[in-house]
Amino acid sequence: MHFTSSLLALVALTTQALAFPLNDLPKRDSGLAVKLSSIGNTRVKAVITNTADHEISFLKFNTFFDSSATRKVSIAKDGSVVPFNGLYRYYNAAKLPKEAFKTLAPGASAEATFDIAETSDLSAGGSFSVFSDGMIPVADGSGTTLTGAIKYSTNELKMNVDGALAAKVQSAIPKLEKRTRIDPDCPGEYRNVLTQGLQTAAGYASRAAEAATNGDQLEEFFKTTDQQTAQNIAQRFQAIAQECGSDSQGSTTYFCDDRFNGCEQGVIAYTIPAQSVVVNCPAYWELPPVVNQGLDPDHGYVVVHEFTHATSIFSPGTQDHAYGYENCIRLSPEQCISNADNYSLYAASVSRGG
């Protein structure tokens, strides 16, 4: 069963269930089928089946098979999307480990179970709609190089939730007690590198704000020339530049270690918008501090990307519809405006003379 048009429109405007750095991968309209079912008050089972006549190896990151508290489905109640309180992960598509993939023979299925109350507040109880659609990246054979992406959409699952029981489900993300700009436990060497990354990001964001105000390259990266939209884009960049201006004050907390268990090989950083938290993974420190040409990520690029997610800096926060220039410029105008990497790419382009 496909989603109702109203639910699809709602999701398109407010969230993307699963998102990947596809980088202009060939798109396939079939090959994987996904069915959702309820197995408890707030627990969901997802069964993914290989409907093709050949073996398929798909990336588990940001799918139902991701062990981290990433978005696995979208949830709606009374015509509104329920806020997601988990994390958004930014990973390096060029350095994916074999463990990040799952292989299915033709006709084979695999299932994953998860509790949607771990990353969303369902204590209001009542009827909820649960659904997901998007693209799942795939690799050939036992390789780790992404070669395509398969489009999928699930059934729309109706769940009648007991709010009192849902409220007892422990959140996947622990509450943060202290609030400081850079975590004081961040070692001196890493703190210095991160401080420089914030300074680089401040420069990117300031130049991007000025460029957006002037309308430079907006049509290329955001598919718009509208003055009001340009002003909104500029204001987001201004807010990011201000946030980057201090390593001891601000609305977000930046961690140098994986405090919330969102890192694994290939993941660069992640953001928890509900708690205004950004975390760098080991792969972040392997990136070049500064890139002077092109659109490849450096430390400042990643900071801009993550800060666009943070609603405490500028609301609404962005989603991860796509990564990489080739895929980002293929998004719809609405998705461009709400996609984190479009902002990083834009900031890099106007700053590096792209």
UniProtKB/Swiss-Prot annotation:
Pfam families: Peptidase_M35. Its cofactor is Zn(2+). GO terms for cellular component: extracellular region. GO terms for biological process: proteolysis. It comes from the Eukaryota. It catalyses: Preferential cleavage of bonds with hydrophobic residues in P1'. Also 3-Asn-|-Gln-4 and 8-Gly-|-Ser-9 bonds in insulin B chain. Zn(2+) binds at residues 305, 309, 320. The active site is at residue 306. It is found in: Secreted. Residues 1-19 form the signal peptide. Residues 20-179 form a propeptide. Keywords: Cleavage on pair of basic residues, Disulfide bond, Hydrolase, Metal-binding, Metalloprotease, Protease, Secreted, Signal, Virulence, Zinc, Zymogen. Disulfide bonds join 186-256, 263-281. Belongs to the peptidase M35 family. PANTHER family: NEUTRAL PROTEASE 2-RELATED (PTHR37016:SF3), PTHR37016. Secreted metalloproteinase that allows assimilation of proteinaceous substrates. Shows high activities on basic nuclear substrates such as histone and protamine. May be involved in virulence. This is Neutral protease 2 homolog MEP3. It comes from Coccidioides posadasii (strain C735). The gene is MEP3.
